[in-house]
A protein has these predicted regions:
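A ligand-binding cleft/hinge motif common to bilobed small-molecule-binding domains
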Residues: 27-36, 81-84, 107-108, 112-141
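Short, Asp-centered acidic motifs that coordinate Mg2+ and/or phosphate
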Residues: 22-23, 112-113, 146
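Acidic, polar ligand-binding/catalytic clefts
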Residues: 3-64
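Periplasmic-binding protein-like
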Residues: 45-53, 118, 122, 126-164, ...
Length: 185
């Protein structure tokens, strides 16, 4: 029986190495570094980092955010995107403990923009949500999610086999459609 545990996303690799958790499954962006240091599955879903602002905000590119307050979750792909984007790196970056805090900051006007996962933003902003006054204005880095286990684990291969079976029988496609996701190739 699995036990699902919320952790500090900024220390996810440390938690895994210390055996506090057995895998990282929730929205883990696959990177070369992670694939070198952990046993990772094949990608299962596509994602991107997006810029979220208040409705009515004039935005044409990340250059509009130079000198503005931009938030992202500490240790996330959003944080990496801010650090690596020529314009966003010149923003006043403030890290938050979770992505939903980033949305609260933008909605409250204490941050000008947030950089976070497309999958989360799609589900949490716009008409009919608690953040109806927010909108996505830019899609930045396209990425893929996978599942990570401790280096040397054979569980990643078993999960890959399960993913292959779930793709073949249409289960993953049906779930992706239900939740507005795009499966990785």
């Amino acid at each position: 029986e699995p036990e699902f545990v919320e952790i500090n996303w900024d220390t996810k690799e440390t938690e895994l190495a210390a055996k506090s958790i057995d895998c990282i499954w929730n929205g883990l962006t696959l990177t070369d570094d992670r694939e070198e240091n952990m046993a990772c599955t094949k990608p299962y879903v596509k994602n991107a980092q997006v810029v979220v602002v208040k409705d009515g905000t004039e935005y044409t590119s990340t250059a509009d955010l130079v000198g503005k307050t931009v938030v992202a979750e500490a240790g996330s792909a959003g944080e990496t995107t801010i650090q690596e984007d020529e314009n966003l790196a010149q923003a006043d970056y403030v890290s938050k403990s979770v992505q939903t805090d980033c949305l609260m900051e933008v909605a409250a006007g204490t941050a000008d923009a947030a950089v976070l996962d497309l999958t989360l933003a799609s589900a949490m902003i716009g008409e009919g949500t608690d953040y109806a006054n927010l909108k996505m204005v830019d899609e930045l880095n396209v990425e893929e999610y996978g599942v990570a286990f401790r280096k040397g684990s054979d569980v990643a291969a078993a999960v890959d086999t399960a993913f292959d079976e779930l793709k073949a029988d249409g289960t993953m496609g049906a779930l992706a459609e239900k939740y507005g996701l795009t499966l990785a190739e």
